Amino acid sequence: NSIKGVNSSDAAITINNSDGTCTANLSNRQGKNLIINGAQLIAQRGTSSTTNGYGSVDRFQVNFSGTDEAPTQAQVDVAAGTTPYSLGFRKALKITNGNQTSGAGSSDYVYYQHKIEAQDISQSGWNYISSSSYITLSFWIKSSVAQSFKGHLKTQDGTSQLYPFDTGSLSADTWTKVTKTIAGNSNLQFDTNNEAGLHIAIMAFIGTDLTASSATENTWQAYAGGIFGGKDNTSTWYTTNDATLEITGVQLEVSDHATSFEHRSFGQELALCQRYFYMHASGAEASANNRAPIATGA
């Protein structure tokens, strides 16, 4: 038996007739978001950088190669009056494109990446080898250029698997929520260790040498080394000088649908980030000795 809300197909409370216990379906349960710093609150390294990799917002890399001018990654404010702002998001991670005077090279790329420890997936409650068990990825994204963007989830353990996806067409300068519900697959493997088990990437641009026309979006497939995002994507953003791309509200949860974002306090989020990178209180001195990455593969 179950109790459902009016016009809802999901049970709010499920009752076990055998022992009389019940289970509540909580959309705001603590710890449901497997992403660390998905609201882009923490930026221990600084608020702006042209560094390749981790340079600004904690736990989110901005990786690039082949650029004529390096892109800038920056923690920025979410503007009041926007939908993400009304949902409690105050920060975003913004990529500002450099001036790519030689055009879109076939091996060029610029993309966001977040890594999750294998043990956090293997012990998440997701029955990842079952096609009837799901995780849902959701995030807010805004581009200064109207186009769609590619992304993927990629596993690390066993035979690496790739799940390519497309954001759908975005209107320029408009925040859009992207949601992807992803079934498990018998080929997935996540070891119980602290290595990077799952990579999540959102591509600003990937060249054609790094794509595969045979890739199928929205399904798991064996990862072909060097293939980043499945199918080709448009180069409009990349060939537009100073084009921008922003993300916030990134959430990955064990669910067959997206639920409300798990907002954590600044202190909670900082503590989670410090497992991977710690800035000493005297970090303003900019001494390399004040920075100590923790030994995990993620």
Segments the model singles out, each with a brief description of its role:
Residues 1-9, 13-298:
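Extracellular and organelle-lumenal recognition/adhesion modules and their flexible linkers in secreted
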